Regions:
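Short helix-coil-helix linker/hinge
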Residues: 102, 112-119
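Sigma70-family region 2
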Residues: 5-6, 32, 43-60, 79-80
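Short, charged helix-capping/linker segments at alpha-helix termini
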Residues: 5-14, 24-43, 138, 143, ...
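Arg/Lys-rich amphipathic alpha helix in sigma70-family domain 2
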Residues: 50-57, 67-87
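Internal acidic/polar
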Residues: 75, 81-105
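A short pre-motif secondary-structure segment
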Residues: 122-123
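Structural recognition of an alpha-helix C-terminal capping motif at a helix-to-coil junction
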Residues: 25, 39-46, 50, 59-71, ...
C-alpha cells in the first residue's frame, strides 16, 4: 500500500491481481447484480489510489479494501433505494460472465443464492482466498461464529445439492 501511495502502478496491479476475485465476490454478495458489482469494484480500486496516502497499516490490506468496497456497495444500494431483495429476485438477476459456464457452476451459484446473507458472504470470501480470521475481523464476528456459520453453510449447500 505504501508503494501505491508513492505512485507505483506495478504495486497497484499486483494488489489488484491478488484481491480482485475476493473483492468482486464480496461486492456481488451485497448487490446481487453483476453489472452494479463491476461498477462498484471499479470505484473501489479507483478509490484505493488516493486513499493509500492515508492508509494506516494496523490490519490486513484486504480488510481495508473490503471496507472500502462494503461502503461503496452500501452507498450504491441506498442510491437505488434497494433495501431488500427476495431470493426470487436474486435468482432472476443472476448474470453469468461466460456463456460456456458449466452446468455444475450454475447449480452451485443457485445453491449459494439460497444461503442467508452472512453465510453467503463467508462462503464467497473464503472460496476467494480470504482466511477465516480476516473474515471474522472484517465482519466484526468472533472467529468461532465465522467458522460455525461457514460449516453450517457447507452443510446446507450439501443438502441443497444432494436434493437436486
Amino acid at each position: 500500500i505504501k508503494l501505491i501511495a508513492q505512485g507505483d502502478m506495478k504495486a497497484f496491479e499486483e494488489l489488484y491481481n491478488k484481491t480482485d476475485k475476493a473483492v468482486f465476490g464480496f461486492i456481488f454478495s451485497i448487490l446481487r447484480n453483476k453489472a452494479n458489482a463491476e461498477d462498484v469494484m471499479q470505484d473501489t480500486y479507483l478509490k484505493i489510489i488516493p486513499a493509500s496516502k492515508i492508509y494506516n497499516p494496523q490490519g490486513k490490506p484486504i480488510s481495508w479494501i473490503l471496507t472500502i468496497a462494503k461502503n461503496l456497495a452500501l452507498m450504491s444500494l441506498r442510491s437505488e433505494k434497494k433495501t431488500n431483495t427476495s431470493i426470487d429476485e436474486l435468482e432472476n438477476n443472476i448474470e453469468f460472465s461466460q456463456k460456456d459456464e458449466t452446468e455444475d457452476k450454475l447449480i452451485l451459484n443457485l445453491a449459494i443464492s439460497k444461503l442467508a446473507d452472512d453465510e453467503k458472504q463467508i462462503v464467497i470470501l473464503h472460496s476467494s482466498g480470504v482466511k477465516h480470521r480476516e473474515i471474522a475481523s472484517f465482519l466484526n464476528m468472533p472467529l468461532s461464529t465465522v467458522l460455525s456459520k461457514y460449516n453450517r453453510a457447507l452443510k446446507k449447500l450439501k443438502k441443497i445439492l444432494e436434493g437436486d
